[in-house]
């Protein structure tokens, strides 16, 4: 516990919070070009083939981004919009691709949580 005199001399030091999405450079989203689209396996105890893409962002940084939803139309040179948000069972994946914008199509036949997957309302 510091004395008042020590606080007068030095003061309290601010806690430095770590940026979780440094490649976005403070923006909510960034546009990028897919350099590689592939699948990876998650950490234990999960088992799957998770769809991910290597994306070169407009900020010049290359990141690994997760492609959410069932099925996708992405390939090399596709232009995508990337947001922050990690995938817990994929180490090093700290970004997600936004569905339904630019070259990324929305998820087909999606009934619930449509806005997250860029799916339009079905005409009934």
UniProtKB/Swiss-Prot annotation:
Q: Which CDD domains does the entry link to?
A: Ribosomal_S12
- Name the Gene Ontology molecular function terms of this record: rRNA binding; structural constituent of ribosome; tRNA binding
Q: Which UniProt keywords apply?
A: Methylation, Ribonucleoprotein, Ribosomal protein, RNA-binding, rRNA-binding, tRNA-binding
According to the lineage, what is the superkingdom?
Answer: Bacteria
Cellular component GO terms, alphabetically? small ribosomal subunit
Sites where 3-methylthioaspartic acid occurs are at 89
GO terms classed as biological process: translation
Q: Where is this region: Disordered?
A: 1-32
Hey, which family's this protein in?
Belongs to the universal ribosomal protein uS12 family.
UniProt-listed PANTHER family: 30S RIBOSOMAL PROTEIN S12 FAMILY MEMBER
* Function per UniProt: With S4 and S5 plays an important role in translational accuracy. Interacts with and stabilizes bases of the 16S rRNA that are involved in tRNA selection in the A site and with the mRNA backbone. Located at the interface of the 30S and 50S subunits, it traverses the body of the 30S subunit contacting proteins on the other side and probably holding the rRNA structure together. The combined cluster of proteins S8, S12 and S17 appears to hold together the shoulder and platform of the 30S subunit.
How would you summarize the oligomeric state and partners of this protein?
Part of the 30S ribosomal subunit. Contacts proteins S8 and S17. May interact with IF1 in the 30S initiation complex.
Q: What is this protein called?
A: Small ribosomal subunit protein uS12
